Amino acid sequence: MNNTLKVEIWSDVICPFCYIGKRKFESALKQFEANDNIEITWKSFQLAPDLKTDTSISIDEYLAIHKGFSIEKTREMNTYVTQIAKQEGLSFNFDRSIVANTLLAHQMLHFARTVGKQEVTKERLLKAYFTDGKNIDDKQTLIELATEIGLDIDKLNQALNSNDFVDEVKADIDEAQQLGVRGVPFFVFNRSHAISGAQPVEVFVETIQQVLKQTQEEIILSDDQVCDIDGNCD
């Protein structure tokens, strides 16, 4: 890659297709000889900003209650998503996932960005939620994850307790609305091309090639597997 590629990704930590889409995007990047000229910024998006964290019910039960599905239907849906994730080398354990608000996690991501560790933090938060069954709305849990990553615990604690990055989280969400984002993941390349959803790897490859060649100026939008603002993932 001779040109700098700036990628902004709107994503939520409890969005399964955001994790799947991350892997597909990463697979696409591997097909280029050099990717050190890539600047990736993870933007905040909350599928359920008013969600109340509840450790007493399962994800299946939550979806059944709030989406009007049967338990059998929600299990079927989550099994389907788990199979898709497995194809990308991911292990989803929805039976362990905790119903949790993601505001604290997004604040942590913004803090991590200030010290150049946003990428590793994003990966750890996604794994914590989908694989490890961690409560990502619990400050102590986030501190433990931060210790693994190597973040400054005292500074992170201060940031979380003082809500230092709430405005940044809200600004990301407002920006997404201005761009017309209706679901995540949503990838924007050099502010000229966009991909919505966990698209096939070849779609990411083709888009990156187009951006680097600067063949077009308008946004090209591809739409596939997404979690929308109503919390529906398909």
Regions found by a protein language model. Name each.
Residues 23-129, 232-233:
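Structural alpha/beta surface segment adjacent to cysteine/selenocysteine redox centers
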